Structures are given as structure tokens and as C-alpha cells.
Amino acid sequence: MPNQHMLLLFNLLPVGSNISTWWNFGSMLLTCLALQTMTGFFLAIHYTANINLSFSSIVHITRDVPYGWMMQNLHAIGASMFFICIYIHIARGLYYGSFLNKNVWLSGTTLLIILMATAFFGYVLPWGQMSFWAATVITNLLTAVPYIGTELTNWLWGGFSINDPTLTRFFALHFILPFTIISMSSIHIMLLHTEGSSNPLGTNSDIDKIPFHPYHSHKDMLMLTIMMTALFIIMSFNPNIFNDPENFSKANPLVTPQHIKPEWYFLFAYGILRSIPNKLGGAVALVLSVTILMTMPFTHTSHMRSMAFRPLMQFMFWTLVTTFIMITWAATKPVEPPFTTIGQVTSILYFTFFIMNPLLGWLENKISITNM
């Protein structure tokens, strides 16, 4: 076909006419993934996975490598952008009932777990103070596993403490896992397109579909432009906004930072971990804080898919959003009153959403039947 349109593939993709801007975050995540893979590749060329040289190699990248500062800052800020987009993407899925497409939701949650692991390994690589101590604290949680905990930890560390073998394997994992994410993303998208997207009303879109291009493709491009503009503005004017000041000092196993904390995007899980005084209990709660998302398709009892017409669940949803922000904030503070109490209360409220979901669905069904 001589004049075949370049976007014919997208022309042939029918999409519901009423999907809102909240549906744009999937394409934004794909862009973030491409950006992270490219900048990561250029950083890996100059990076040295050695405890004596890694910190210096980051300094070398930012000072001596042409545009190295740009690659390093784009990669660091891009990770934060990635998590902002993914949390909004998940929130949209919860609000509009996208989780009822089970395969898509479960593959997405698996993707989130792999992404969090990748980001954690990446945070350790600069071998700054916070990198080292965050790695020590988080990997040490494996010792809470009954019977095999200590052996598991030593196996991960490659010795009896965090050392050169740990950094080497973390770099190897940080390099290889993005390719797993790319593969999983392809599966995620294929599973989505077997059934198609949901929409804000939670109804079947088959009766009213429009071509993806030019309508939704232009909408996607607008949001991508906004995201990239925000990324470059942050990179140009305040590149260290998401960084911890402690991480500008080289790792020293003999000096413990006053307050150990991971990157901001893990603080909600870290806050939940910290709110339980028992080590094993905290580790279980940490894992549950993410894996509990997998229960959503199986605990949905309401006759309505979307929360658009469910005021009680809307209240619970916005409580969850506020709780998420509160846990993140409390986890940045020292382990002392009132922050410990705030952390414990918000952790309970976080899990309350998932417990109340089936109960409120059942109650709303009762109310709607009574009013008929």
C-alpha cells in the first residue's frame, strides 16, 4: 500500500470514547521505562561496581563524562517520575475497578514488585552512606525468615556482611531486571488488549468506540509533553530535590546515619514496616503492603464496577490516598512520639481499605436493592 499511514496500527485499535486523562499514565510509564533503559545504559558504560571505586565513578560521570550530569540526573529523577506515574496508575485502577480484569491486574502487581526490587538495587549502586545503610537494614529483614533466614541473607550478601560481592550482584540484578520489566510490560499490554480498557463509568465500551489515532494518541502526546517538561525543569533547576543529603558522603560502615530511610517512593512500605515493633511481623507487613493489591479482584462484591457512583467507597478511597501520603511523611521522621503513633494509626487505616472493600460493596448492594 503506497500511502499507508504510519499509525495504521493505532487506527485499527478501537478505544472507548470516554476514557479520561487518568488512562494516559500507561503510555507515560512506557516512556519512563524507555528513558530509564537508555540513560541507565549510558551510565553503566562508565560505572564501576566496586566498593572502593563506585562512589568515585559516579563523581567521574557527573564531572568528566560529556553530558554525564544530564544522564545521571535524568536517571535519578526519572525513577521518581516512574513511581509517581505508577502510583497514579494503580490509584486509577482501584477507583475505576480496572482490577476486575484479573490477568491484567495480577501481571501489573507482579510488575510493581519487580520494579520496586530494581529501584532498590539501583539505590545501592552509588555506594553513598544512605545507599549502604538502607541496603543493610532492608536485606537484614531476610534474617526474620524462620530456619533459613541467616543462610538466605548470607547468600544474598555473598558473605557475612554487605561488601564487594553484594555490590557486584546488585549491579548485575539492576542491569538485568529492566529487561524482565520490558517483557512483563509486553505481556501486561497484550493481556489488556484481549479484553480492552475499562472506562470511568465502569460499563462496556463496545457500543461506543473510536480509533486510537488521532483522538487518544494526541491526548497521550500532550501528557507526555507535560511529563517530559516537568522532568527537564526539575533536572535544570533542582536536580537533587529527591536525593538524601547523606548520600553525598561515601559509605562508611563505622558511622551510622542519624535516621536511616530509603528513597521517598518506598517510604509508605518502610513506614508500615517501622510501625510494627516485631521484626518478623514488620517484614510480613512490608510484603503485604504491596501484595495485598492482588486480593482486590477476589474481594469485589459490589454490583457496580467503578467507584464513580459509590460514595461510601469513594470516602474509603480518598482516606487511602491521604493515608498513603501520611505514612510517607511519618516515615521521614525519627522513630519517636508522635511519629510512631501516626505511623501505627495510618498503617491500620491503609489495610482497613482492603478489609472494608468487600463489606462496603455488600452494604451498598443491600441499600440499592432496598431502594428499588
From Swiss-Prot:
Question: What does the subunit section of this Swiss-Prot or TrEMBL entry state?
Answer: The cytochrome bc1 complex contains 3 respiratory subunits (MT-CYB, CYC1 and UQCRFS1), 2 core proteins (UQCRC1 and UQCRC2) and probably 6 low-molecular weight proteins.
Role: Component of the ubiquinol-cytochrome c reductase complex (complex III or cytochrome b-c1 complex) that is part of the mitochondrial respiratory chain. The b-c1 complex mediates electron transfer from ubiquinol to cytochrome c. Contributes to the generation of a proton gradient across the mitochondrial membrane that is then used for ATP synthesis.
Enumerate the residues binding a ubiquinone: 193
Question: Where does the chain bind heme b b562?
Answer: 75, 174
Q: Which InterPro entries match?
A: Cyt_b/b6_C, Cyt_b/b6_C_sf, Cyt_b/b6_N, Cytb/b6-like_sf, Cytochrome_b, Cytochrome_b_C_euk/bac, Cytochrome_b_N_euk/bac, Di-haem_cyt_TM
The UniProt entry's GO biological process terms, in alphabetical order, are: mitochondrial electron transport, ubiquinol to cytochrome c
Q: Which Gene3D superfamilies match?
A: Cytochrome Bc1 Complex, Chain C (1.20.810.10)
Q: What is the cofactor note?
A: Binds 2 heme b groups non-covalently.
- The source organism is Pantherophis bairdi (Baird's ratsnake)
Q: Which cofactor does it need?
A: heme b
Q: Coiled-coil regions in this chain?
A: none
Q: Where in the cell is it found?
A: Mitochondrion inner membrane
Q: Where are the transmembrane segments?
A: 25-45, 69-90, 105-125, 170-190, 218-238, 280-300, 312-332, 339-358
Name-wise, this protein is: Cytochrome b
| Family classification | Belongs to the cytochrome b family.
Question: Other comments?
Answer: Heme 1 (or BL or b562) is low-potential and absorbs at about 562 nm, and heme 2 (or BH or b566) is high-potential and absorbs at about 566 nm.
Binding annotation for heme b b566: 89, 188
Which terms in the GO cellular component ontology are assigned? mitochondrial inner membrane; respiratory chain complex III
Alphabetized, the UniProt keywords read: Electron transport, Heme, Iron, Membrane, Metal-binding, Mitochondrion, Mitochondrion inner membrane, Respiratory chain, Transmembrane, Transmembrane helix, Transport, Ubiquinone
UniProt topology in membrane: Multi-pass membrane protein
Q: What is its main location?
A: mitochondrion
What Gene Ontology molecular function terms does this protein carry?
metal ion binding; ubiquinol-cytochrome-c reductase activity
